Amino acid sequence: MIVHQQLPMSVNVASLDFLLIELVHTAKRLAEDRKKKSSSEKSIESDFQMLESIGFQVGRKITERLLLNRNRITETTDVMRFLCRELWPIVFRKPLDNLKTNRRGIFVLTDTYFYWFTKMTAMTGTEMAQITTPYFYFPSGFIRGVVYTFGYSAQVIAQCPNLPTCIFHVKFSPNPTQTSPGKPSTSESSQTDTSTRPANSQTPTTTRASSYTTLVSTSNQVSNEAEASAVETSANQAQNTEDATENEDRLPS
């Protein structure tokens, strides 16, 4: 009988990179084809949210695998440290560089050398937003999948201030999810999730991988700009009022 400890813990790095990047390219091609056929914006958006759903499942299953021989983590701060130090390197080759929190459910994760952006040519403004946006869906879904496994739901706001840096604002919902990890949300929990979703977000195709991701461009041409500003303001205020050693956790590269 095969036990979990005998399962392989890694795959070929090049194969994983090709797979993940090709997922993004496939979604972009599908979206472009729909756009040529004059499909609705909702149909085009669903192609990219497919990436978020895949990232959600990857994050959830990797977390479940690594938690087999660990004590249960319950605090949100410990969850985010576990994500930054142990889970992120599995998919993106290196730990996250910086983790900040206001101790009130808002975390700012910074990767100053995001692997997917390292080969991109330097660009700014609208051009950079158009190129980088599709690559945020998978990691944003990955973060939500990890958080979900620990019994929480969260909204993720992703942005690229400059290449190859990327920043993720993670805002935990006030009430933890009642659905046990690995099981689809019930109708009751689905209704709770809907109440925490931004007003302009679309209805997801699945309840357990519902979209909580907002993508922020450097030109601020986004429909959910107010929410992003609110999260950043809260994080900045907390950083100014609390001791830096309590609010900032610099992670080893």
UniProtKB/Swiss-Prot annotation:
- Determine if Membrane is one of this entry's keywords: no
- Which keywords fit this entry according to its UniProt record? Phosphoprotein
Chain spans, region Disordered: 175-253
Q: Where is the composition biased (Low complexity)?
A: 185-196, 203-214
Compositionally biased tracts (Polar residues)? 175-184, 215-242
CC terms in the record's Gene Ontology section? cis-Golgi network; trans-Golgi network; TRAPP complex; TRAPPI protein complex; TRAPPII protein complex; TRAPPIII protein complex
Record InterPro entries: NO_sig/Golgi_transp_ligand-bd (IPR024096), TRAPP_component (IPR007194), TRAPPC6/Trs33 (IPR037992)
GO biological process entries: endoplasmic reticulum to Golgi vesicle-mediated transport; intra-Golgi vesicle-mediated transport; intracellular protein transport; macroautophagy
**Pfam families listed in its UniProt record:** TRAPP (PF04051)
| Post-translational modification Phosphoserine, affected residues | S180
Q: Which PANTHER family match?
A: GEO08327P1, TRAFFICKING PROTEIN PARTICLE COMPLEX SUBUNIT 6B
Which family does the similarity line name?
Answer: Belongs to the TRAPP small subunits family. BET3 subfamily.
- Name assigned to this protein: Uncharacterized protein C13G6.05c
- Organism of this sequence: Schizosaccharomyces pombe (strain 972 / ATCC 24843) (Fission yeast)
